[in-house]
């Protein structure tokens, strides 16, 4: 702060005082108006999510209505849509994101705040003399005031980027829950099939023991059957643990514990879609609407604008403007504007400019890397989905029907005493293995589609084609249901068509509010 102790003519004094007062008043007004409305961030994020096929968020944490809704949802078999909706209300990761949204609000508001003006007061008295000198001074940072419009513009851009980033994180959580649901249902199906194989091989082992006790088979043949049954029990136990762990992971993502974690499921997965998406269309969709890509572009825009502002104001440094009023010992008053200027002799802001330019280069390189990686990753993910779809088809149309024929003809040959019961039981176990491979292939296919959805940043167009489900483990074990083409290959009917949605099974939809 500078105190001007030189008297000036009254006319110029009034003129200077008026200009300074107006400048400080305008500065205060600008600083007061430089606020951003963050009250609609939650609604804006939900709008972004809806545009990308994501779920709406429950921004009110654990209200009574939310608890009632969750209880109602969990009273029915859990679908992936319901799992995502529960997570939007209960997931600890979502609560963390809500907190990060509050931090983003604080950062944005902080960015547009001008440093408070400084008020200086001093009272100086003459030693052993009458009277005192009173000095009042008010100063404000000039750079903050000049840069305020630019900072406000940058803050709005940063606010938009924060919304995109939070929306992307929410979408990621929803896809994590969806993946966990597929893993849980798939693990439950595998556990059921491994248990069936273990039962079949245990039956074979028990039969072998009776034959050995009767002296009909050797000790070598007996232990072959016993060892196969032991391995099957081990595999069944591991599959059961895997299913429980997958269920635990899903409950953790949904934010469920205790009695709420005991939900039931229909334990069926959708069949692959008939026609997969065009990778060119998916790349175009990702380029236009991927939340991560949009956030990276917004970040590059922010650093470009920040670099321009830094370069324009590099010489001002810590310059302040103000107004002083001084009352002398004799009662006279002098007053006027002040300017506290940093002379850019040694430091001309080169470091700030270099830092801003480096940040801009990093942001541009990051954006280019995201764009390149997205294109390449989408191509690879599309190919992976296609290959897994082919694997599902091979299981449905070839392997499972072939194993069914082997099991059926083995039974026929056993009836004519051409082969023994051990061969029949082994053929049945191999048939169950084929079914397990089919169910695992379907699970892997949907996990690959979720990964592709992550890369695209929105729901895949072909999601609307999902209409049919796989057979459940119960259908396979009790009704003889097989994938299509089994009847035509085997030359006999094996049960209900598994490509139709079983009674009571959830249909597979990706629109908000639907079930899958």
For the regions a protein language model found, what residue spans apply to each?
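Amphipathic alpha-helical coiled-coil segments and their boundaries
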Residues: 80-83, 90, 97, 141, ...
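Short segments within alpha-helical structural elements
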Residues: 231-258, 366, 400-461, 484-490
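Charged, solvent-exposed faces of alpha-helical coiled-coils
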Residues: 93, 100, 107, 151, ...
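Coiled-coil heptad-register positions
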Residues: 105, 112, 119, 170, ...
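A small-residue-enriched
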Residues: 34-57, 85-144, 247-256, 283-351, ...
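Periplasmic alpha-helical coiled-coil/stalk elements that build and connect Gram-negative outer-membrane
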Residues: 34, 148-150, 157, 164-285, ...
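Terminal intrinsically disordered/low-complexity segments used for targeting and assembly
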Residues: 2-11, 15-89, 240-285, 451-516
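Amphipathic alpha-helical segments within well-ordered protein domains
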Residues: 84, 139, 206-210, 283, ...
């Amino acid at each position: 702060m500078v105190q001007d102790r030189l008297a000036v003519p009254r006319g110029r004094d009034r003129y200077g005082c008026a200009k300074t007062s107006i400048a400080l008043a305008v500065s205060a007004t600008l600083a007061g108006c430089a606020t951003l409305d963050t009250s609609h961030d939650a609604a804006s994020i939900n709008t972004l999510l809806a545009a990308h096929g994501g779920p709406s968020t429950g921004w009110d944490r654990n209200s009574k209505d939310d608890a009632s809704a969750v209880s109602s949802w969990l009273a029915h078999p859990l679908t992936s849509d319901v799992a995502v909706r529960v997570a939007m209300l209960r997931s600890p990761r979502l609560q963390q994101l809500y907190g990060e949204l509050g931090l983003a609000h604080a950062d944005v508001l902080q960015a547009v705040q001008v440093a408070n003006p400084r008020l200086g007061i001093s009272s100086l008295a003459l030693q052993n003399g009458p009277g005192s000198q009173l000095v009042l001074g008010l100063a404000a940072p000039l750079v903050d005031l000049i840069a305020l419009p630019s900072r406000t513009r940058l803050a709005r851009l940063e606010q938009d980027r924060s919304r995109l980033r939070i929306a992307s994180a929410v979408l990621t959580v929803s896809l994590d829950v969806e993946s966990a649901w597929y893993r849980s249902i798939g693990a439950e199906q595998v556990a059921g099939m491994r248990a069936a194989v273990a039962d079949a091989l245990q039956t074979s082992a028990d039969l072998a023991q009776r034959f050995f006790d009767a002296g009909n088979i050797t000790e070598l043949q007996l232990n072959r059957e016993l060892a196969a049954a032991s391995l099957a029990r081990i595999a069944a136990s591991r599959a059961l643990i895997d299913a429980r762990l997958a269920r635990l992971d899903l409950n953790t993502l949904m934010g469920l514990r205790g009695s709420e974690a005991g939900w039931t499921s229909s334990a069926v997965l959708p069949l692959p879609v008939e026609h997969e998406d065009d990778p060119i269309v998916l790349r175009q969709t990702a380029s236009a609407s991927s939340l991560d890509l949009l956030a990276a572009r917004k970040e590059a825009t922010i650093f470009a604008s920040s670099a321009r502002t830094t370069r324009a104001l590099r010489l001002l440094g810590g310059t302040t403007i103000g107004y002083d009023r001084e009352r002398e010992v004799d009662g006279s008053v002098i007053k006027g504007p002040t300017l506290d200027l940093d002379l850019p002799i040694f430091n001309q802001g080169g470091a700030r400019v270099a830092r801003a330019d480096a940040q801009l280069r990093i942001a541009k390189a990051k954006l280019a890397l995201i764009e390149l990686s997205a294109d390449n990753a989408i191509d690879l993910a599309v190919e992976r989905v296609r290959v897994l779809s082919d694997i599902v088809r091979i299981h449905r149309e070839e392997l499972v029907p072939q194993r069914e024929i082997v099991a059926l003809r083995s039974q026929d040959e056993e009836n004519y005493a051409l082969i023994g019961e051990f061969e029949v039981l082994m053929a049945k176990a191999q048939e169950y293995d084929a079914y397990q491979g089919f169910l695992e292939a379907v699970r892997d296919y949907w996990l690959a589609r979720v990964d592709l959805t992550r890369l695209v940043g929105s729901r895949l167009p072909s999601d609307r084609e999902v209409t049919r489900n796989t057979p459940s483990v119960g259908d396979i074990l009790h009704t003889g249901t097989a994938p299509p083409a089994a009847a035509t290959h085997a030359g006999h009917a094996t049960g209900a068509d598994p490509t139709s949605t079983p009674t009571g099974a959830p249909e597979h939809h990706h629109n908000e509010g639907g079930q899958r």
